[in-house]
């Protein structure tokens, strides 16, 4: 889960805010002496200070310009629930996260995405160029196993008439989809493992099953559920635009957008210990705008 580290920073940020200025009250007492709130605050600031002040500052700046609704956060949260299936809650717990803290980070990420979108120049010519290689979303089921021998065993059972959905429930190691017969959410080009995606798009008719596909995750058998024929540019423009914007939400473009927002906010760092917190966002060496993309 790529966003868990940032969620941890959100939790630490909240702790630092609570500790700031608390003074000499002890948080831990021992016969050898006490650990005070001030000592804890300074230690946390030394270790996490730059990352925490970045997120707190950017959140303040972005909330002044952009709005993220509870509905948007919940929709994003649901994606992770579906992606991780039965292991979602244990994944949060193992990273010392709660539903609330994870949603707070999702809200922050959505703010950054909106700032990045606002910094894009989505021209007609760029969309038409993107349309040439764009394909509509495809829906498939899959069975994931660890070894080729098991995949061949499943392949034989399919040829003998056993149902794909039943075999997915029995064999698939993808716990997020196995209970649902291996059904994946619709996806488009560039969203999945390259070899998996190529094999999925090569399927032509509903219920067609691929050969054994080796990906970075293991061995797959893929069954086509739904494949929509690509329409004209005029018909598909809204879908093309959404996919194009999604493709441009890269680290480079997000950083460029945050640099622009930071410059406009006239930031003044008062704590000398944090003077370098925004060094990566005030340098002029990297690309200054997402408008050069595609």
Curated annotation (Swiss-Prot):
Keyword terms: Cell membrane, Isomerase, Lipoprotein, Membrane, Palmitate, Rotamase, Signal
SUPFAM superfamilies per UniProt: FKBP-like, Triger factor/SurA peptide-binding domain-like
Cysteine pairs bridged by disulfides in the record: none
Alphabetized Gene3D superfamilies for the sequence: 3.10.50.40
Membrane topology term: Lipid-anchor
InterPro entries (alphabetical): Foldase_PrsA, PPIase_dom_sf, PPIase_PpiC, PrsA_foldase, Trigger_fact/SurA_dom_sf
Catalysed reactions, as listed in the record: [protein]-peptidylproline (omega=180) = [protein]-peptidylproline (omega=0)
A single MF term (Gene Ontology): peptidyl-prolyl cis-trans isomerase activity
Record lipid sites (N-palmitoyl cysteine): 22
Domain PpiC per the UniProt entry, residue ranges: 135-226
Signal sequence extent: 1-21
EC number: 5.2.1.8
Subcellular location: Cell membrane
GO BP field: protein folding
Leading EC class: isomerase
Lipid attachment points (S-diacylglycerol cysteine): 22
Domain of life assignment: Bacteria
GO cellular component: plasma membrane
Entry similarity comment: Belongs to the PrsA family.
Protein task: Plays a major role in protein secretion by helping the post-translocational extracellular folding of several secreted proteins.
Name of the protein described by the UniProt record: Foldase protein PrsA 1
Originating organism: Listeria monocytogenes serotype 4b (strain F2365)
Gene that encodes the chain: prsA1
